[in-house]
UniProtKB/Swiss-Prot annotation:
Keywords: Electron transport, Membrane, Mitochondrion, Mitochondrion inner membrane, NAD, Respiratory chain, Translocase, Transmembrane, Transmembrane helix, Transport, Ubiquinone. The gene is MT-ND1. Its EC number is 7.1.1.2. One of its GO terms (biological process) is mitochondrial electron transport, NADH to ubiquinone. This is NADH-ubiquinone oxidoreductase chain 1. One of its GO terms (molecular function) is NADH dehydrogenase (ubiquinone) activity.
């Protein structure tokens, strides 16, 4: 694999993330009947560039009591993992075509928990630590349902490769037979990426701004980039799993356009939800998962396991 392939994946991701921050501020602005950023460049289009310059030219301060190595490693690890998770995504062709792409993505997203934990612990601040513990509890809790939902969808798909989902959904989106799974998946992705209404890690009133409270300038920007890269990545995964775009090898551009539009709509839904809903209480968040989602997803997983076995003897319908 050549360096150019990696760069042609990473640079567009970072650009998309930069402009997603602008889109979010604009969308939230218009939803609150104001303009949003509109000073830097035409219609505020150069705002992300100005932000990047400002953040990366500031001095990266760190608390005297912090653990230096971990404090610096955490944001680097967060961004590295966020970018690594894009490797097996078929858009329509993945960077590396893995047999167990889904498993790889789950493993990477589990590793991301460590960056949160380290940043909270290494900051040596009580607020950062509480925020980190909340974030870790939330992330690993919702990963359980994400994994089970993924398994159910892949049982319908019949293969662990993500590219196979494109073939599976040639005639019908998987959201139609699996809509309860899709709804739970979407809510779980919101919780997994620490977005409103599940942004308890950064409850301003009680925790200042969560696990990254002690970070400034560059390292803070890395956390920010990682968070938004994860948001786009989750929406891309939702598109692949439930809204499969039609892919013809003769016109791959059509797939890309189709795929991008769906991902953008889902990302806008994320922002819309942020503008509309108040934050959950922590016990409600955990009740929703362990008492509602987990039993439901387990039941649906059993259903999806038994479905191919039940229908195995039926002659093909097409």
């Amino acid at each position: 694999m050549f360096m150019i392939n990696v760069l042609s994946l990473i640079i567009p991701i970072l650009l998309a993330v930069a402009f997603l921050t602008l889109v979010e501020r604009k969308v939230l602005g218009y939803m609150q009947l104001r303009k949003g950023p509109n000073v830097v460049g035409p219609y505020g289009l150069l705002q992300p560039i100005a932000d990047a310059v400002k953040l990366f030219t500031k001095e990266p301060l760190r608390p005297l009591t912090s653990s230096m190595l971990m404090f610096i490693m955490a944001p680097i690890l967060a961004l590295t993992l966020a970018l690594t998770m894009w490797i097996p995504l078929p858009m329509p062709y993945p960077l590396i075509n893995m047999n167990l792409g889904v498993l790889f993505m789950l493993a990477m997203s589990s590793l991301a928990v460590y960056s949160i934990l380290w940043s909270g612990w290494a900051s040596n601040s009580k607020y950062a630590l509480i925020g980190a513990l909340r974030a870790v509890a939330q992330t690993i809790s919702y990963e359980v349902t994400l994994a089970i939902i993924l398994l159910s969808v892949l049982l319908m798909n019949g293969s662990f490769t993500l590219a196979m989902l494109i073939t599976t959904q040639e005639y019908m989106w998987l959201i139609i037979p699996a809509w309860p799974l899709a709804m739970m998946w979407f809510i779980s992705t919101l919780a997994e990426t620490n977005r409103a209404p599940f942004d308890l890690t950064e409850g301003e009133s009680e925790l200042v701004s969560g696990f990254d409270v002690e970070y400034a300038a560059g390292p803070f920007a890395l956390f920010f980039l990682a968070e938004y890269a994860n948001i786009i990545m989750m929406n891309i995964l939702t598109t692949i799993l439930f809204f499969g775009a039609f892919h013809s090898p003769y016109m791959p551009e059509l797939y890309t356009i189709n795929f991008t539009v769906k991902t953008l709509l889902l990302t806008t839904t994320f922002l819309w939800i942020r503008a509309s809903y108040p934050r959950f209480r922590y016990d409600q968040l955990m009740h929703l998962l362990w008492k509602n989602f987990l039993p439901l997803t387990l039941a649906l997983c059993m259903w999806h396991v038994s479905l191919p076995i039940i229908t195995a003897s039926i002659p093909p319908q097409t």
